[in-house]
Curated annotation (Swiss-Prot):
NCBIfam families: rpsS_bact. It comes from the Bacteria. It comes from Ralstonia pickettii (strain 12J). Keywords: Ribonucleoprotein, Ribosomal protein, RNA-binding, rRNA-binding. GO terms for biological process: ribosomal small subunit assembly; translation. This is Small ribosomal subunit protein uS19.
Length: 91
């Protein structure tokens, strides 16, 4: 279910402050955040945001195609190592 247009996109206030400061100073240093639930706005384009995945901060370079998505979509939380191999196929 999508969010109501009337409400607008959700973004944490502390992240918005950091982004606005980085845009004003034209700072290219990654912005560290734990807010995976925040929506990517057009102001974020060209910035690198380090999104926490539960273990470490994953750098995410924001492009135009990412606008409207959530930050957490681009920092995967699970690592897939593959299914167990079939013992008969190894012989």
């Amino acid at each position: 279910m999508t969010r109501s247009v009337k409400k607008g996109p959700f973004i944490d206030a502390h992240l918005l402050k950091k982004v606005e400061a980085a845009v004003q100073t034209k700072d290219k240093k990654p912005i560290k955040t734990w807010s995976r639930r925040s929506t990517i706005l057009p102001d974020f384009i060209g910035l690198t945001i380090a999104v926490h995945n539960g273990r470490q901060h994953v750098p995410v370079y924001v492009t135009e195609n990412m606008v409207g998505h959530k930050l957490g979509e681009f920092a995967l939380t699970r690592t897939f190592k593959g299914h167990a191999a079939d013992k008969k196929a190894k012989r």
